[in-house]
């Protein structure tokens, strides 16, 4: 870095001395000499951070040494400290002081603080206290430090209680501002500093502010170039000017008020609120970003208090946003950076309470009175209530307007006229001074857009009240960046035609886009008209809405243009205004019926005339217009009328409250149709109206005296219908409003919105094709909306309901307060100042209004894929799992057409006709059966481009299009054998590979079936498919439950192939909550192979999957540079619905963004690993990685390397601090043997290994069992006691079962026997502190029920409890005891494990079952069979009365029937295929039962089914009933297996851990099982 010229740098005086030095390149060849000449010392101590040291310290040391003549010259000591706010601490200060003392520094030492604000603040405080004060110099390297923190002598360190709370005023001897440092400053840091530059101009110098406005594009363009020498050369002079200007302001203020007595407080403009935001959002939000938001909020506060005009607020906000700084918490960048963290208003006020400007409890805030001027020469005292209104998301309106009120309200400029004026002036030639321009979001979007198109230049005059716009006569250039228009419908429609006038520049087209609502608002008729006139326009979204790509062809052709104008008059105005610049004269013909909102078309014609273009209206057809070629001539001055739609709100308040309001600048001569509202609506409702050509005054009747309107046509003023509706709500009678059909496609469906929100007030409404009907209620019957009024982000909804709130019976909350900024940013100020209403801030945030939101979880599913891939099978599975009807579209097409598909193809229709009918059917079901169904499509559906468009649009709108595939060779083999469908006309494999990209394009999910076609046709959905459907369509409860656990684990699968490890996977996943597939360790990483591995893993593990590609640099095996393969594998994982994606934060931005955009229901684990141990948890070096992970992740994973045990404690402190700041879950670990403690203490989703795996995924990894044992030793897991209650129980195998499983999973619990038949003995045990759960057997299964707090539904129906589970209450330490029954679960498990499928929908015929016995276990068996879909269920017992008692106690839908004897068996319509015996087996079976059972067992069945007898007695192991069944060819299940199964379920309920069932079986049978998983 060197000086570019030999001139002396510029100096700025501060406190009477020229101590601030500013120029380019002074660090190396000027600072050393100045130090030696003017800041002499024997020792200079240069301190900087580790990021800057290597770049800037060695060359300075070289220059320093070169300037020292003798060995006796001064010495230079250098020190590097960690970067970031964490270094601004007592510990860092002590470290520096101790080091300086060790270097024998004395009182003549000079500290050189090289760095940003952290370095300057902290080193200044060191200088202030070292040896009672030594000299120091500031060398700021960031723009923020150059213009702010380095100037003024404020020094400080942070404490745990807050920032800058301990420090001193200590002036630097020199401040060297070398602008060359900014060449390497990252763009975000540079822009961060611009906030302080804007601040000083805003409070002190309007001229400098104007300079900042004018130079924003060039400054931002330069800053966004890659860092390095010459980057800022294009802005060299302006950069120096703005830094000098800002530094001079601060120096002048400090010189007048060094110790912050009053004037210096002005430098805190934006900081009172900004610091509060920063306190909650740091470190993710930078200081300048927080201050930028704070400036806007404090300016809005000044406007609310009546000391600042709205135009100044708008001007400030636009200047801030023009530099890329945020202006609200709703800014997309802020949401992304902070992970959407909320800032509760009460917490913000608490943070503001410790502001040093405050006077005791009185908060003081710097208020602007104009740009460049403050309200007072100090901070102003402001009440908390006013601050809360500005900070809150919603406004609480307390009703009560003085009945004597007579007020005058001037609404802002008309949005409609403002937008038209900007278009006309930009297309025109010359300069136009535009007065009363609306300062709102919509108009700002328009102004920004025409500037970006090069259509005009502009400046502000009269403190922002006048826009001076110079048009360029229609010379527009295409924009390389998309023009974002938010929810500005007017701007989007006008600009669609204007952009068609652009000529190519660096690009040959321009993209118009907007927010989510704008992307569903219609624009099709306008696009159709322009397309027909030769303009190339592409829809970039699924519907006929924005975003649009519009070709830059230098204008449209002209001639005759036909346009449908029944939806929006803005389509007409858009073409009219651009028509003079068409290549030929234009004849615009409006077709399709009566144009909507004719007054707005007339407004456009009148304004065009003012700007020099006369449109000729056809004498023969009033809906045809002739526009000659021409150029607009800008008038010298144009005044925007106030907005007539907005004027309806203050006039309506007068009407509803019985007061008087005058709008002084809207009258009968207005261009706007809504100006008729007072005469056409308010006067017939009973108001007194006085209207002149230029003003309107309304006086309302006494409150409650408004009259309903039997019918009013509001087509000329459709936007005003919302105002009329709220008045009608309290008017006598019923009001019918028509002519407003277009209001369904505005910012929201306004008719539906008004009906829903009026309903909250108890108002009855109805609607018809083009209107709404409102039945009024007396004022005293109005209800108060408990959850507030939801505004749909629609300004007119918010303002209308604020009118109704003025006469409510209790305060009303209007949600989404800031949406009024679209047309009247100061509306709430007007309510307070002009109408005297008491407003309060309400921190309510709107929830989702379900009726107007598409519930994607209920959307129909469309399945695509090759014939033979399993579409029909998986469709039936999915329909069963989701409880939806399934429709095979091939079969449906055959049904509707009355012919088979081969008949269609080989008949007159042919392939073309078949595809046409297939497409028509797809369109029909998408339109009419869009929710609650599962459809499978024909394999060739993707051959049709139109069908592909439908499928793509469906998935892009949130629908599920599922691609089903299995091994390609299996599909081919199947198709070669299938003769039921038309043969392919080409090679089957060629067909598949041609269609594969089409299937991928049309689908957003894919299921790879690992099961051969023959093995699944008649089965229940396999485990892998059930997991898949739960992941993509389920309620997410499985993952939510997992992540809510106090201790959760995932096992890292380190195998080269899942297929080769399927036998060991069930063992290694025990005790874990998820399984990590290390894709980088797989031998075959091709997409099809990985898809097969994912499906195989789901089958083997049955739990959520973490999909991980660990790169070489982060300790894995995947190549760091293979971005293409990485992205393709991530996309595959997302399409397969994996529950978690481990996404390394070192991937390029495009990978992170793509994965985030496509993630759907998958959760991102944003990870960073440091295998080389280069980062420290102690010094803040992990903070940037945490911040980056916070932007992208649902979970954050940070893995370091432990060099000492202390590293684990540092990690724990870091994690605690981060979790205190943000709720995003954090996995934070240290690798290595010394890091094991961090794994034990991690808690959330700890990665674990297992001895059965070939190797550990990371050094120091432990098993889940080892971690649980360690947690027990540390006291984090308490040993609990589990019991079996009953009598006799001495021979029970339950203790063996549960104690084996406790040991296996590393839990310290014990299970023992409590032999009793007395319920009161049980009552004492189950309330003991260490009680963990219990099993209950006879005779207590019924007796324990009154002792419990809750009993499950299944236990209630069965009438018996065999399991007691302690359930912690939310937010309470008191436990509730739940009684459940696992006997039936054990039975179901045993049946399923032997291959008995659920009968609920598995077959088209019914399947029956038989239960033998009449005791308590009989009831559990009946419940098990019912849950498995069997009906009827027959019962067989000796005592017929007992059977009748049982039958009567169950609901009738159980379909229970007593079986009388052998003869009755022959009369059964459906013979049982499952028998459950619940009678004792240690005694001979009753002969009559035996005879009947033998007949049942030998009865033939109509379908080929697995026939099973389940024995509930486990002594002896092989019973008489089992022998009978086996002799008849039935399969049998011994009772010991059911005992193991019900106990296995009990263990899961108690611990949340699912062990292997074979381990439970082994324990019950007394077989040897592993005693440990270590």
Swiss-Prot record:
Keyword Repressor among UniProt keywords: no
Residues binding ATP: 865-872
Annotated region described as Shikimate kinase, given as residue ranges: 858-1052
A Pfam family reported for this protein in Swiss-Prot or TrEMBL: Shikimate_dh_N
One of the GO biological process terms: amino acid biosynthetic process
Cofactor(s) the record lists: Zn(2+)
Segments for region (3-dehydroquinate synthase): 1-384
Catalytic activity: 7-phospho-2-dehydro-3-deoxy-D-arabino-heptonate = 3-dehydroquinate + phosphate; 3-dehydroquinate = 3-dehydroshikimate + H2O; shikimate + NADP(+) = 3-dehydroshikimate + NADPH + H(+); shikimate + ATP = 3-phosphoshikimate + ADP + H(+)
Entry function: The AROM polypeptide catalyzes 5 consecutive enzymatic reactions in prechorismate polyaromatic amino acid biosynthesis.
Matches recorded under HAMAP family: EPSP_synth (MF_00210), Pentafunct_AroM (MF_03143), Shikimate_kinase (MF_00109)
The protein's name in its UniProt record: Pentafunctional AROM polypeptide
Organism: Verticillium alfalfae (strain VaMs.102 / ATCC MYA-4576 / FGSC 10136)
């Amino acid at each position: 870095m060197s000086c570019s010229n030999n001139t002396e740098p510029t100096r700025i005086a501060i406190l009477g001395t020229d101590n601030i030095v500013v120029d380019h390149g002074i660090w190396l060849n000027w600072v050393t000499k100045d130090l030696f000449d003017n800041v002499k010392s024997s020792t200079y101590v240069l301190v900087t951070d580790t990021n800057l040291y290597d770049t800037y310290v060695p060359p300075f040391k070289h220059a320093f040494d070169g300037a020292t003549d003798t060995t006796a010259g001064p010495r230079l000591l250098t020190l590097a400290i960690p970067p970031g706010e964490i270094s601004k601490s007592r510990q860092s200060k002590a470290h520096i002081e101790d080091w300086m003392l060790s270097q024998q520094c004395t009182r003549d030492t000079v500290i050189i603080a090289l760095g940003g604000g952290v370095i300057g603040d902290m080193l200044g405080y060191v200088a202030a206290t070292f040896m009672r004060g030594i000299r120091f110099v500031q060398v700021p390297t960031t723009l923020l430090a150059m213009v702010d923190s380095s100037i003024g002598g404020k020094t400080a360190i942070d404490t745990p209680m807050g920032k800058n709370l301990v420090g001193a005023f200590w002036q630097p001897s020199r401040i060297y501002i070398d602008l060359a440092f900014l060449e390497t400053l990252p763009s975000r840091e540079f822009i961060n500093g611009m906030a302080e530059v804007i601040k000083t101009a805003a409070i002190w110098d309007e001229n400098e502010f104007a300079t900042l406005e004018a130079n924003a594009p060039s400054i931002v363009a330069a800053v966004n170039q890659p860092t390095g020498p010459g980057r800022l050369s294009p802005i060299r002079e302006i950069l120096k000017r703005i830094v000098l200007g800002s530094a001079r302001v601060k120096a002048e203020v400090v010189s007048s008020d060094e110790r912050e007595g009053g004037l210096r407080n002005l430098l805190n403009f934006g900081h009172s609120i900004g610091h509060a935001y920063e306190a909650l959002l740091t470190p993710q939000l930078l200081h300048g970003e927080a201050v930028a938001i704070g400036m806007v909020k404090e300016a809005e506060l000044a406007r609310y208090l009546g000391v600042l005009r709205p135009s100044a607020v708008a001007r400030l906000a636009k200047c801030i946003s023009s530099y890329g700084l945020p202006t609200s918490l709703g800014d997309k960048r802020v949401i992304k950076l902070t992970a959407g963290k909320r800032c509760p208003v009460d917490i913000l006020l608490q943070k503001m309470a410790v502001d040093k400007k405050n006077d005791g409890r009185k908060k003081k805030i710097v208020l602007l009175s104009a740009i460049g001027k403050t309200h007072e020469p100090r901070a102003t005292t402001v009440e908390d209530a006013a601050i809360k209104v500005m900070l809150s998301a919603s406004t609480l309106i307390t009703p009560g307007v003085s009945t004597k009120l007579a007020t005058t309200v001037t609404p802002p400029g008309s949005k409609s006229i403002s937008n038209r004026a900007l278009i006309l002036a930009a297309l025109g030639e010359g300069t136009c001074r535009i007065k009363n321009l609306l300062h709102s979001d919509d108009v700002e979007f328009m102004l920004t857009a025409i500037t970006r198109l090069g259509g005009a230049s502009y400046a502000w005059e009269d403190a922002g009240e006048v826009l001076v716009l110079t048009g360029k006569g229609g010379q527009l250039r295409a924009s390389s960046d998309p023009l974002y228009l938010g929810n500005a419908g007017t701007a989007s429609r006008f600009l669609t035609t204007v952009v068609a006038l652009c000529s190519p520049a660096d690009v040959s087209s321009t993209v118009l886009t907007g927010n989510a609502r704008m992307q569903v608002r219609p624009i099709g008729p306008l696009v159709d008209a322009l397309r027909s006139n030769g303009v190339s326009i592409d829809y970039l979204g699924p519907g006929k809405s924005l975003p649009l790509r519009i070709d830059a062809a230098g204008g449209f052709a002209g001639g005759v243009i036909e346009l449908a104008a029944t939806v929006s008059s803005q389509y007409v105005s858009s073409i009219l205004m651009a028509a003079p610049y068409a290549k030929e004269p234009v004849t615009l013909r409006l077709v399709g019926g009566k144009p909507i909102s004719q007054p707005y078309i007339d407004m456009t014609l009148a304004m065009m005339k003012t700007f020099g273009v006369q449109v000729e209206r056809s004498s023969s057809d009033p809906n045809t217009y002739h526009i000659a070629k021409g150029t607009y001539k800008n008038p010298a001055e144009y005044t925007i009328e106030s907005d007539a739609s907005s004027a309806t709100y203050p006039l309506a308040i007068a009407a509803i409250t019985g007061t008087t309001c005058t709008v002084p600048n809207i009258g009968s001569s207005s261009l706007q149709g809504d100006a008729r509202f007072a005469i056409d609506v308010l006067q017939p409702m009973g108001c007194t109206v006085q209207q002149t050509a230029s003003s309107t005054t309304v006086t309302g009747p006494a409150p409650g005296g408004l009259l309903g309107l039997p019918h009013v046509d509001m087509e000329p003023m459709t936007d005003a219908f919302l105002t009329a509706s709220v008045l009608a709500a309290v008017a006598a009678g019923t009001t019918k409003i028509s002519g407003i059909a277009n209001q369904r496609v505005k910012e929201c469906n306004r008719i539906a919105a008004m009906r829903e929100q009026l309903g909250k007030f108890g108002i009855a409404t109805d609607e018809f094709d083009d209107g709404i009907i409102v039945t009024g209620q007396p004022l005293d019957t109005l209800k108060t909306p408990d959850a507030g009024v939801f505004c749909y982000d629609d300004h007119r909804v918010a303002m209308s309901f604020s009118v109704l709130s003025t006469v409510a019976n209790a305060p009303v909350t209007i949600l989404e307060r800031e949406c009024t900024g679209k047309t009247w940013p100061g509306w709430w100020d007007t309510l307070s100042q002009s109408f005297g209403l008491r407003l309060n801030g309400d921190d309510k945030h709107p929830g989702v209004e379900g009726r107007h939101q598409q519930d994607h979880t209920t959307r129909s599913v469309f399945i695509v894929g090759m014939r033979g891939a399993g579409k029909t099978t998986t469709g039936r599975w999915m329909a069963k799992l989701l409880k939806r009807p399934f429709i095979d579209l091939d079969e449906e097409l055959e049904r509707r057409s009355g012919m088979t598909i081969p008949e269609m193809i080989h008949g007159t229709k042919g392939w073309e006709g078949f595809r046409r009918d297939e497409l028509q059917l797809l369109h029909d079901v998408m339109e009419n059966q869009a929710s609650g169904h599962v459809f499978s499509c024909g394999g060739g559906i993707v051959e049709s481009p139109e069908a592909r468009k439908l499928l793509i649009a469906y998935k892009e709108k949130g629908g599920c299009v599922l691609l089903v595939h299995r091994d390609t060779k299996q599909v081919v083999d199947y198709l070669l054998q299938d003769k039921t469908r038309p043969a392919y006309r080409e090679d089957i494999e060629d067909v598949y590979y041609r269609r594969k990209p089409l299937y991928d394009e049309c689908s957003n999910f894919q299921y790879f079936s690992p099961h051969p076609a023959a093995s699944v046709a008649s089965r229940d959905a396999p485990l892998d498919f059930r997991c898949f459907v739960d992941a993509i369509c389920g309620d997410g409860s499985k993952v939510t439950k997992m992540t809510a656990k106090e201790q959760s684990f995932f096992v890292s699968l380190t195998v080269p192939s899942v297929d080769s490890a399927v036998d060991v996977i069930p063992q290694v996943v025990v005790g874990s909550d998820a399984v990590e597939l290390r894709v980088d360790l797989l031998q075959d990483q091709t997409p099809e192979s990985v898809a097969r591995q994912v499906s195989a893993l789901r089958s083997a593990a049955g739990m959520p999957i973490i999909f991980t590609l660990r790169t070489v640099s982060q300790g894995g095996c995947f190549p760091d540079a293979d971005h293409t393969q990485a992205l393709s594998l991530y996309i595959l994982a997302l399409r397969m619905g994996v529950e978690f994606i481990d996404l390394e934060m070192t991937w390029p931005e495009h990978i992170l963004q793509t994965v985030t955009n496509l993630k759907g229901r998958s959760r991102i684990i944003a990870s960073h690993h440091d295998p080389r141990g280069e980062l420290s948890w102690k010094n803040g070096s992990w903070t940037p990685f945490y911040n980056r992970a916070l932007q992208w992740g649902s979970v954050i994973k940070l893995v370091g390397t432990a060099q000492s045990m202390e590293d684990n404690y540092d990690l724990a402190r870091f994690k605690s601090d981060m979790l205190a700041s943000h709720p995003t879950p954090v996995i934070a670990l240290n690798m290595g043997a010394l890091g094991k403690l961090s794994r034990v203490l991690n808690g959330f989703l700890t990665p674990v290994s297992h001895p059965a795996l070939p190797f550990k995924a990371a050094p120091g990894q432990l098993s889940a069992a080892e971690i649980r044992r360690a947690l027990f030793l540390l006291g984090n897991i308490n040993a609990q006691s589990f019991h079996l209650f009953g009598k006799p129980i001495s021979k029970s195998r339950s203790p063996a079962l549960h104690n084996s499983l406790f040991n296996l999973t590393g839990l310290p619990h014990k299970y023992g026997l409590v032999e009793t038949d007395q319920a009161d003995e049980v009552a004492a045990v189950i309330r003991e502190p260490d009680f963990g759960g219990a099993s209950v057997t006879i005779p207590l299964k019924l007796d324990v029920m009154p002792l419990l707090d809750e009993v499950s539904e299944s236990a209630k129906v069965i009438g018996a409890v065999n399991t007691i589970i302690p359930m912690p209450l939310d937010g309470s330490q008191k436990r509730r005891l739940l009684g459940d029954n696992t006997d039936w679960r054990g039975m179901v498990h045993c049946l399923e494990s032997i291959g008995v499928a659920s009968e609920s929908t598995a077959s088209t015929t019914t399947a029956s079952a038989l239960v033998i016995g009449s005791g308590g276990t009989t009831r559990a068996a009946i419940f098990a069979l019912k849950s498995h879909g069997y009906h009827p269920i027959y019962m067989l017992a000796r005592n017929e009365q007992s059977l009748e008692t049982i039958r009567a106690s169950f609901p009738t839908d159980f379909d229970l029937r007593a079986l009388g004897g052998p003869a009755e068996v022959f009369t059964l319509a459906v013979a049982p295929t499952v028998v459950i015996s619940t009678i004792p087996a240690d005694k001979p079976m009753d002969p009559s039962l035996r005879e009947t059972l033998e007949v049942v067992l030998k009865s033939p069945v109509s379908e080929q089914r697995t026939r099973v007898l389940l024995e509930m007695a486990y002594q002896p192991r092989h019973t008489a009933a089992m022998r009978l069944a086996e002799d008849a060819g039935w399969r049998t299940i011994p009772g010991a297996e059911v005992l193991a199964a019900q106990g296995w379920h009990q263990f899961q309920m108690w611990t949340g851990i699912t062990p292997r069932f074979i381990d439970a079986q082994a324990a019950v049978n007394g077989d040897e099982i592993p005693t440990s998983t270590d």
